[in-house]
């Protein structure tokens, strides 16, 4: 059985968007008193790979000392190999609490937006993956007030929800469950499941507010969700992927890219 110790994994390539995402990792690590592991994988012979890691360490140490960054233990691991392969090997041996990754901005091609590495990690990881677009100014989890949770409501899906709450439990926020009604579906069909989820969450997480929205499908799913999230000031989007369902895997990867591109919203992929 795969181990799951308390640490945060940050796949790292020294880019501006990697550094921006890492600020959230320090915030979370300080809250839970756990370690951050920066994993840098390189394919070519990089003569300056150790120097780059040392420069990054100097930067973080100075930020912590100046009080601009929460104090947290961290370490760098350097691996030669294909990034997604090295990440896969690492998390298979020792599963993290959450993986936090930066993503490129909207000036990139849409297929490159999440990036092949991030998309691959979203697909293979059992741990939640938190993807932060470089255009998003988010330095603390305390800034997250509204989470949009895209759900099929075909199942209470509590396992995926609980994996998110493992690292979001200390914070106060509203989670908005959003379901797009397909042709012929009526909202009343889901009343029992909605009542169950509301009662479960209010009993176990009294500091969390819930809201439910069932939207008739008139546009594409990505556009419907994006319109709702923009109108309701959603800070983070959460979606569930099913490793065993190839349609789900393809759908979530495609939806994730479109939503982050259109709404420039941080994304949590759950399993």
Which residue stretches match the model-derived regions?
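Small/aliphatic-rich secondary-structure junction motif
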Residues: 1-51, 145-193, 198-211, 234, ...
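Gly/Ser-rich helix-loop-strand patches that form or flank binding pockets
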Residues: 4, 89-137, 230-271
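Short, well-ordered secondary-structure micro-motifs
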Residues: 49, 112, 142, 160, ...
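Short helix-capping segments at alpha-helix termini
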Residues: 65-71, 203-207
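Rossmann-fold cofactor-recognition segment
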Residues: 73-76, 212
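Charged docking surfaces used in two-component/phosphorelay signaling
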Residues: 78-86, 217-222
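A short, acidic, amphipathic alpha-helical segment used as a generic capping/interface helix at domain edges
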Residues: 198, 219-230
């Amino acid at each position: 059985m795969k181990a799951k110790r308390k640490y945060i994994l940050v796949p790292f390539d020294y880019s501006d968007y990697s550094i921006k995402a890492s600020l959230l990792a320090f915030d979370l690590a300080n809250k839970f008193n756990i370690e951050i592991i920066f994993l840098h994988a390189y394919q070519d012979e990089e003569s300056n790979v150790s120097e780059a890691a040392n420069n990054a360490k100097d930067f973080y140490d100075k930020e912590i000392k100046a009080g601009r960054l929460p104090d947290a233990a961290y370490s760098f691991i350097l691996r030669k190999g294909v990034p997604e392969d090295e990440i896969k090997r690492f998390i298979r041996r020792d599963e993290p609490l959450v993986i936090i990754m930066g993503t490129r901005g909207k000036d990139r091609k849409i297929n490159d937006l999440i990036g092949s590495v991030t998309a691959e990690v979203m697909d293979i990881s059992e741990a939640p993956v938190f993807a932060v677009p470089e255009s998003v100014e988010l330095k603390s989890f305390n800034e997250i007030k509204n989470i949009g949770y895209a759900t099929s409501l075909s199942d209470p899906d509590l396992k995926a929800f609980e994996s998110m709450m493992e690292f979001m439990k200390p914070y106060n926020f509203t989670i908005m469950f959003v379901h797009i009604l397909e042709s012929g579906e009526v909202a009343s069909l889901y009343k029992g499941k909605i009542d169950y989820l509301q009662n479960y969450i209010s009993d176990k997480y009294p500091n969390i507010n819930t809201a439910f929205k069932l939207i008739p499908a008139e546009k594409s799913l990505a556009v419907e969700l994006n319109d709702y999230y923009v109108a309701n000031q959603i800070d983070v989007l959460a979606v569930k992927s099913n490793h065993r369902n190839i349609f789900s895997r393809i759908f979530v990867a495609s939806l994730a890219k479109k939503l982050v591109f259109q709404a420039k919203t941080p994304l949590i992929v759950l399993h």
